Amino acid sequence: MEGMKAQMMKQFSAMGANRVQVSIYSWMYDADGNDVSKDYFPDLYEYCQGLREYVIGITPNGGANATVIYGTKNSSTMQTEYDKQWNLISGPPSLYYGSDQYSACNNLTVAKGRDLAYLDIQNYNQVCVIGAEMAKQFFGTVDPVGKTLKVNGNNFTVVGVYAARGDEGDNSMKQMDNMVVFPYTASRVLGGARFTEYIVKARDSESANTAIAYIGGFLKGLVPQGSGDYEVRAADYWQQYQNESFNMIGMVLGGIA
């Protein structure tokens, strides 16, 4: 239990501090029951650009479920493995959607090539940036930049590789870098649920508190009551919640023993 808790703490730390979690819920449907909820991200993105004194970046926090193929490598045939503490140590790459500010929000730096760009989002470019572990598993010693991945049959060009965040000998931390990040507009071809979760990266803890107040006020005027709701809070809320959960489980198991 302590091993799993320590590993999760390391993973939270690797994503960086001063992150704000934004959730926007909407329940608007037409007469046929189709979801016609508004996409709030463009408005939220533009608003956060005006908060540069406090905010470094903003990105959707969502993922895709797709098969990735390069040569003989196929994500659908990769086996998921866990260590004795039930930490994920190997498996297929995780697939994420992001804005041009995804790396800033997740404590990532580009080691090769380039990052996602604003025009990639606007022009629906079929490009991606991959993590260091994904590059190793799919490409070995070959430079991935410029290579093409097949993702559910669609071509996506690798434009960059993120530097490793995990230790070389820590398989669970390396798994954090086993990932592919697509422009969030790629969801039109790869699918996935409508975005409801977003991450805002603040400059420091004081700026995070200020951003929470400003963004909350902005969303109050943007999300109509009766057909939607929102929540803005420090992203380490989940870290605190996990710590409390692990402590409670430990107390229960200790009582049983």
Stretches with model-predicted labels:
Residues 4, 199-203, 209-215, 221-257:
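Peri-transmembrane interface segments
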Residues 101-116, 126-224:
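Mid-to-C-terminal secondary-structure elements
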Residues 8, 43-44, 183, 241, ...:
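Hydrophobic alpha-helical segments typical of transmembrane helices
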Residues 50-138, 158, 179:
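Short beta-strand boundary microenvironments
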Residues 26-39, 84-89, 161-165, 200-208, ...:
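Structural beta->alpha junctions
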Residues 2-84, 89, 194:
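Membrane-proximal extracellular/periplasmic loop immediately following the first transmembrane helix
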Residues 40-44, 99-102, 211, 245:
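Stable alpha-helical elements in mature extracytoplasmic
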Residues 19-21, 57, 115, 148, ...:
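Residues at or immediately flanking beta-strands
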